[in-house]
Curated annotation (Swiss-Prot):
Family as reported in the entry's similarity comment: Belongs to the ponericin-Q family.
Gene Ontology biological-process annotations: defense response to bacterium; killing of cells of another organism
GO CC terms in record: extracellular region
Function: Antimicrobial peptide forming an alpha-helix in watery and membraneous environments, enabling it to perforate membranes. Active against Gram-negative bacteria E.coli DH5alpha (MIC=5 uM), E.coli MH1 (MIC=0.6 uM) and P.aeruginosa PAO1 (MIC=10 uM) and against Gram-positive bacteria B.subtilis VKM B-501 (MIC=0.6 uM) and A.globiformis VKM Ac-1112 (MIC=0.2 uM). Has cytolytic and hemolytic activity.
Keyword list, A-Z: Antibiotic, Antimicrobial, Cytolysis, Hemolysis, Secreted
Protein name: M-ectatotoxin-Eb2a
Intracellular or extracellular location(s): Secreted
Keyword Transmembrane helix: no
Tissue: Expressed by the venom gland.
Length: 27
């Protein structure tokens, strides 16, 4: 499940400003 989700996120997230910062806060 997470494998498929991560593939989608890896394609979409780089195009969304502030995503990296958000992920760093979550982790």
């Amino acid at each position: 499940f997470w494998g498929a989700v991560w593939k989608i996120l890896s394609k979409v997230l780089p195009h969304i400003p502030g995503t990296v910062k958000w992920l760093q806060e979550k982790v």
